[in-house]
Amino acid sequence: MAHSVKIYHTCIGCTQCVRACPTDVLEMIPWDGCKAKQIAPAPRTEDCVGCKRCESACPTDFLSVRVYLGPETTRSMGLAY
């Protein structure tokens, strides 16, 4: 099982998480739930390496993007080098 990336309704559509992701897991799509009219879903969670850069980049008080770590994969363990 890969890492799980969840985007919450508190997303403000700022694109900070999308720009911070080194593996392009996130992308912006149209969404009427915020002023920016866009949200960042995670269509490619299998590429997530669990670095949590998206969480660090999120400017909202309640992090709108959260990474829930699954078992380590060969790919995610490679970040240590």
From Swiss-Prot:
GO biological process: photosynthetic electron transport in photosystem I
Positions bound to [4Fe-4S] cluster 1: 11, 14, 17, 58
Complex and partners: The eukaryotic PSI reaction center is composed of at least 11 subunits.
Subcellular location: Plastid, Chloroplast thylakoid membrane
Pfam short name (any one): Fer4_21
Cofactor note as given: Binds 2 [4Fe-4S] clusters. Cluster 2 is most probably the spectroscopically characterized electron acceptor FA and cluster 1 is most probably FB.
Gene3D superfamilies on file: 3.30.70.20
Cofactor (UniProt): [4Fe-4S] cluster
Sequence ranges assigned to domain 4Fe-4S ferredoxin-type in this UniProt record: 2-31, 39-68
Topology relative to the membrane: Peripheral membrane protein
The reaction(s) this protein catalyses: reduced [plastocyanin] + hnu + oxidized [2Fe-2S]-[ferredoxin] = oxidized [plastocyanin] + reduced [2Fe-2S]-[ferredoxin]
Gene Ontology CC entries for this record: chloroplast thylakoid membrane; photosystem I
Protein name per its UniProtKB record: Photosystem I iron-sulfur center
Main localization of the protein described in the UniProt heading: plastid
Residues binding [4Fe-4S] cluster 2, per UniProt: 21, 48, 51, 54
Free-text function comment from the UniProt entry: Apoprotein for the two 4Fe-4S centers FA and FB of photosystem I (PSI); essential for photochemical activity. FB is the terminal electron acceptor of PSI, donating electrons to ferredoxin. The C-terminus interacts with PsaA/B/D and helps assemble the protein into the PSI complex. Required for binding of PsaD and PsaE to PSI. PSI is a plastocyanin-ferredoxin oxidoreductase, converting photonic excitation into a charge separation, which transfers an electron from the donor P700 chlorophyll pair to the spectroscopically characterized acceptors A0, A1, FX, FA and FB in turn.
GO MF annotations, alphabetized: 4 iron, 4 sulfur cluster binding; electron transfer activity; metal ion binding; oxidoreductase activity
Enzyme class: oxidoreductase
PANTHER family for this protein: PHOTOSYSTEM I IRON-SULFUR CENTER, PHOTOSYSTEM I IRON-SULFUR CENTER-RELATED
InterPro entries per UniProt: 4Fe4S_Fe-S-bd (IPR017896), 4Fe4S_Fe_S_CS (IPR017900), PSI_iron-sulfur_center (IPR050157), PSI_PsaC (IPR017491)
